[in-house]
Amino acid sequence: MAKCYFYNEDCLASMKRMQEKGFKVDLVLSSPPYNTGRPSNSKRSIENLESRYDSHLDDMTDEQYAKWITDIFNNFDKILNKNGVILWNVSYGNEKPNSMWVSLLSILQNTNFMIAEMIVWKKKSALPNNVSPNKLTRIIEPVFVICREDEFKTFNANEQVKSVSKTG
């Protein structure tokens, strides 16, 4: 039986150790910090942000964030088996709505990955947008299904969907 390990640490440290040991994976599921850069006056929000990221500055410029994400994807490439897939869940912030698109473009231009599919996650418990009350509530988030460009032909995305879970 295959063993499954979970590590609660910076993904770059985990991937470095995996590379050193020659470990490979078939699937990467990643939901990185969204680079929201949003200030909050609420004590609860500040406590939650501090507990979520010990050392990550979630307020980079779009260019810094794109480079950081692209570096992570270049490391994904080193640990991903042939025909492996990345599920990348990312969203757009209220104050930096372009960050997601700038980073996605950087991945597509600076790595050998491509978007094979996109899943739209309808969040059942989407909260009202109290950070910027003049913006729409974020009720969906994309999950990009990403594979290597040269492996797209073997990406089997056309199987019949047998069931779809209702989330909202």
Roles of regions detected by a PLM:
Residues 2-168:
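Core catalytic lobe of class I
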